[in-house]
Regions:
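Acidic, aromatic-enriched beta-alpha/helix-loop junctions
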Residues: 39-70
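A structural detector for beta-sheet-dominated domains
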Residues: 20-22, 31, 52, 69, ...
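N-terminal trafficking/processing presequences and adjacent post-cleavage segments
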Residues: 1-33
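Short, conserved beta-turn/loop elements at beta-strand boundaries and strand-helix junctions
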Residues: 34-39, 82-86
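Short, compact, well-ordered microdomains
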Residues: 61-95
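Short linear regulatory motifs enriched in tryptophan with gly/pro/ser
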Residues: 4-6, 23, 27-29, 48, ...
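Contiguous interface-forming segments/domains that mediate binding rather than catalysis
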Residues: 3-4, 12-15, 36-39, 55-60, ...
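Surface-exposed, interaction-prone regions used to assemble/regulate multi-protein complexes
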Residues: 28-31, 37-43
Length: 95
């Protein structure tokens, strides 16, 4: 499993990742990455990632398994933060 970094997600902006759901997978788009101020408790920089899921998404927060475009696996905890008629926006926080 790959270690999530801001650099990793910044390279994925505009690309889709496949996220496992009950009964299959969904394509979620990596929309943006926000680097936050580094603090003394970490050696790396905290960051947030914003993903766009299909409007038909289950809209639940929780741990998700995904596959990146390069085939690597990644687990993350996603929280839905907004919805439109076209998509559900999720936030991932890496403190």
């Amino acid at each position: 499993m790959i270690i999530p970094t801001a650099d990793l997600f910044e390279a994925l902006v505009g690309q889709d990742i496949n996220v496992s759901i009950a009964g299959g997978t969904e394509s979620w788009r990596v929309v943006s990455v926000k680097r936050r101020e580094q603090h003394s408790l970490r050696t790396d920089q905290p960051f947030n990632v914003y993903l766009s899921a299909p409007a038909s998404n289950d809209r639940r927060q929780g741990t998700r398994s995904s596959t990146l475009p390069n085939g690597e696996s990644l687990e993350f905890f996603g929280v839905p933060v907004s919805a439109t008629k076209d998509a559900i926006s999720y936030e991932l926080v890496f403190n």
